[in-house]
Regions:
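Conserved acetyl-CoA-binding loop-helix of GNAT-fold acetyltransferases
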Residues: 103, 109-122, 145-149
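Conserved beta-hairpin
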Residues: 55-71
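A short beta-loop-alpha structural element at the N-terminal edge
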Residues: 6-20
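Conserved GNAT-fold acetyl-CoA-binding loop/helix
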Residues: 26-48
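Conserved GNAT acetyl-CoA-binding A-motif
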Residues: 117, 124-135
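Conserved acyl-donor/pantetheine-binding loop and adjacent beta-alpha core of acyl/acetyltransferases
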Residues: 72-100, 108
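Conserved catalytic-core motifs of GNAT/GCN5-like acyltransferases
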Residues: 76, 135-136, 148-159
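Conserved beta-strand-loop-alpha-helix junction that forms the acyl-donor binding cleft
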Residues: 108, 134-144
Length: 159
């Protein structure tokens, strides 16, 4: 990817493009191998983006021409996180969770996920977060591999 990318908080003007990206990646996963178990129109879907947008948690990665990827950043930890032996001494308020990291199929293997995760690290530092937790399904082999390659520590069955 030779073009400069920008990551920013999404606006209402981005909503349709985010939903199109969700639909495109779900179609791609259905045609290949659906590691994350996403279903078009169910998750991720318009409601996912609308809720995150309303909460100021939806972020987009764009290159000036196209929406390349998106993610949701917040402190909401899924139910299963309670059973994982996380690093001691970190309160829930000091945790940032990356949810619904999605890259448009036309831009896979261009480093978009890496850009989004580096942005999440900067965001966490700027907002007093001491830990980043990556919400990824344990059988999502490419997702887990990505996080390991980017030197994220995996605890238990989630990263």
């Amino acid at each position: 990817m030779g073009t400069e990318v920008q990551i920013r908080e999404a606006t209402h003007g981005d909503l349709d493009r985010v939903v199109e990206l969700y639909d495109a990646i779900c179609d791609y996963l259905d045609a290949t191998f659906n590691y994350p178990g996403w279903t078009r129109g169910e998750y991720p879907a318009r409601w996912t983006a609308e809720q995150a947008l309303a909460n100021g948690e939806l972020y987009v990665c764009a290159d000036g021409k196209a929406l390349l990827g998106t993610c949701i950043l917040n402190g909401v930890q899924p139910e299963g996180y309670r059973d994982i032996p996380w690093q001691e001494g970190i309160s829930p308020a000091e945790v940032l969770v990356v949810h619904t990291l999605a890259v448009h199929p036309s831009h896979l293997r261009e480093g978009v996920s890496g850009h989004l995760l580096r942005f999440a690290e900067q965001y966490a530092q700027g907002h007093g977060k001491r830990s980043i937790r990556l919400d990824v399904y344990e059988r999502n082999v490419p997702g887990v591999r990505l996080y390991v390659c980017l030197q994220q520590k995996c605890d238990g069955k989630t990263c």
